Amino acid sequence: MIMKMTHLNMKDFNKPNEPFVVFGRMIPAFENGVWTYTEERFSKPYFKQYEDDDMDVSYVEEEGKAAFLYYLENNCIGRIKIRSNWNGYALIEDIAVAKDYRKKGVGTALLHKAIEWAKENHFCGLMLETQDINISACHFYAKHHFIIGAVDTMLYSNFPTANEIAIFWYYKF
């Protein structure tokens, strides 16, 4: 069951944040006005985990922002955080599914909830950013008809992850 985040369940937001396997990278290319990509597989996969979010109450209290939590038997196994963006799109700031529930429809259900929220709030579509090394996420977005709209090679340049490339995905209604 998907529930909107409230003050009461806000503590559950970081529960689905678990490591994922990095087994390669996407290599985007822009040719004749169209983004395409190939993939490079690593000989030695590794695990990566994002830091927990410091969740602020604005996602409970303010219009133009929302977070939704996916529960199974009272356990939070998925989350999505979304807000209005300056360009008319709803920006998915974060989506996460606990590792034991990946590829079982939880992410798709959360994405459908984000689409519903964005349409109710009159956005032109969804957008998000992920890293080139998160191939599973990139496949997920492509499978759900998102297209690459931009690539940023400098976004992470001041961080230990400077070798990662930001890929911006769009889904227009």
Swiss-Prot record:
Superkingdom of the organism of origin: Bacteria
PROSITE patterns, per database record: GNAT (PS51186)
Substrates-to-products reaction catalysed: streptothricin D + acetyl-CoA = N(beta)-acetylstreptothricin D + CoA + H(+); streptothricin F + acetyl-CoA = N(beta)-acetylstreptothricin F + CoA + H(+)
Keyword Ubl conjugation found: no
Enzyme class of the recorded protein, top EC level: transferase
GO terms of biological process kind: response to antibiotic
Domain N-acetyltransferase: 21-173
Gene3D superfamilies, A to Z: 3.40.630.30
GO molecular function annotation: acyltransferase activity, transferring groups other than amino-acyl groups
Disruption phenotype: Deletion mutant is susceptible to streptothricin.
Enzyme nomenclature, EC number: 2.3.-.-
Pfam families listed in its UniProt record: Acetyltransf_1
UniProt keyword annotations, A-Z: Acyltransferase, Antibiotic resistance, Transferase
Subunit details: Homodimer.
Function: Involved in resistance to streptothricin, a broad-spectrum antibiotic produced by streptomycetes. Detoxifies streptothricin via acetylation of the beta amino group of the first beta-lysyl moiety of streptothricin.
Family (UniProt): Belongs to the acetyltransferase family. GNAT subfamily.
Name of the protein: Streptothricin acetyltransferase A
